[in-house]
Amino acid sequence: MHKRLLLLGGVAVTVLMIAASATARPAAISTARASDATPAAAPFAQSWASVPHAAAARQAKSILVFGMEQDITGFNTALTCCGAYWAAVTGNVPVVRGAYNIDDKLRHVLDLVASAKATKTTLTYTIRPDASWYWGGKKTPVTYKDFAYTWQQLVDPRNDVASRSGYDQITGFTHKGAKQIVFTWKEPYADWPDLFGLVYPSQALAGQDFNKIWANCVCGNDGEPISDGPFYVSNYTKGQGLTLKVNPFWYGKKPSLKEVDFKIITDTNTEVQAMRGGEVDAINPTFGVNLAQLKGINGITFNQVPGLYQEHIDIQFGPKGQPLLRAPWMRQAIMMGIDRAAIIKTVYGSLAGNTSPLNNIVYYPADAAYKSDFGKWNFNPAKSLALLKKHCTGGPSAVSQSNSDTWTCAGYPAKFRYTWTASNATRTTQEAIIKQQLKSIGIEITDAALPANVVFGPTGVPSGNYDLANFAWVTLPDPAGFVPTWSCGGLNNYLNYCNRKATALMNASQTELDPAKRARLFQQADALMANDVPTIPMYARPNPLIWKSTVLGMKNNPSQVGFTWNVEDWKWKS
């Protein structure tokens, strides 16, 4: 996938959702070859009808069922509309490969290319000689044209991509034969290993509008499935799920499984019960206290690792947000009014471990460069109340859970919409706690729990239509992915925040090749942004992966590459 942040909201580790355009393919669609004689040649409902209900029967057929917490409405995760975690882990990572893969130890491993080399002036990729596309049963080679096409689409101003970072430093290319491409830099790009994380098939997409491709399939311009990974998307049906089938032309290790079915289960509690009851063989759920019931169950493996998941509450600065949020003292008051440590204890319970409030928005606690810049705004309701008294009227005289008074500030009531995705038990609990905590200091929260396709659709978070929005970013190890999120005019900057000094520092980091100097630039930027409080970092969310103990080969990956990074290794225990 591309080096960008992926949105995680809603009922799970998920998703930036947008409805398919009028010109997109129908929602229920088969992208398998007509010659496929299996039920998977039809939409998912028919495919699912042939999947055995008993795990032992699935094992006999080498079929695995994975619980999928969120639907998707597009597989082109490079677009602003479609930065969906579940789209990436189902339709990108196991299907369309990139220069590097990232393993469970967060190491970059050569994947589509045999070698990659960056200098101050060039970036050279030598493509694996055996790398080929599966296109509706036909075999076509992966060539330099695919890398060139990918770069051209990502820098084309007509395309609504979420990030051009790094790609916009490339000025042109040459090639040596079909399997080597040499890009030239305008300036070197520090995080170059995360470029070309997904390479598009140029021949299969010829003549297509990049903004509209892959709305309901991962396919070529003829609707036939396309893949250079271990699997291809055989079918997808909105609201139901999708099926992956083995790509016979995959250059890597031959998968042991013949089929992986992703069954959409949008309620987190229902998902847990599906795992307990054997309806699904594995889940990658939203981390929450409800998962405790799966620990210690015979026959279930429960794996939990520190994740690169930034759980946060975005604050809207733009015209669609409440005007009071543009005042730094209000944002500071809100953050000091939220007891993040208490929330962690409540929503995670015995699973919390050493999870603590996150006080940085470019680094995670395990990073050596992490500094507790936002710690100055830790829970302090008395100080928060004093700030509100200084700027507002009509609020409470003391902090009290029974308070019913709301401040009025500069003619506006201290009343804000709080948006999160419905059906998520963890975030619903989180919102209820925050609502009560802020009520005790005279700030009123109105509930805006909505379906994911509304929250992350064209009129939701990407449009800036919220006051406070609770979701998460899932990232790669390098902080470069945060640059288009926090910088002025950044393509991922849905909150419309701008600190020009912080932006200049982050932009400078993009071409600084010395790791220590680069870290200092990010540290300085974070310190400046901490003064502004553009967002409220909550915590670095742990990442769980839970599967039947009779399934072998699953390894949790804490980054946005996700759990399908090694799907070809999955197999049933013999």
Each model region followed by its residue ranges:
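Surface-exposed binding/hinge segments that line
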Residues: A57-Q59, K117, T122, T126, ...
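Aromatic- and charge-enriched surface segment that lines or borders ligand/interaction sites
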Residues: A114-D160, V182, E271-A274, L324-L325, ...
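Ligand-site clamp/hinge motif
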Residues: A131, D222, N247-Q293, L308, ...
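Short, low-complexity disordered leader/linker segments with a strong preference
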Residues: M1-A60, G172, S397-T408, S574
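Gly/Pro-rich hinge or "lid" segments in bacterial periplasmic/extracellular proteins
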Residues: I102, G197-P255, E259, P381-A386, ...
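N-terminal lobe/hinge region of extracytoplasmic solute-binding protein
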Residues: Q46-W48, L64-K120, R128, Y149-Q152, ...
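Alpha-helical secondary-structure segments
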Residues: V65, V142-T150, A178-T184, P188, ...
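Detector for C-terminal structural segments
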Residues: S35, A45-W48, T90, T237-G241, ...
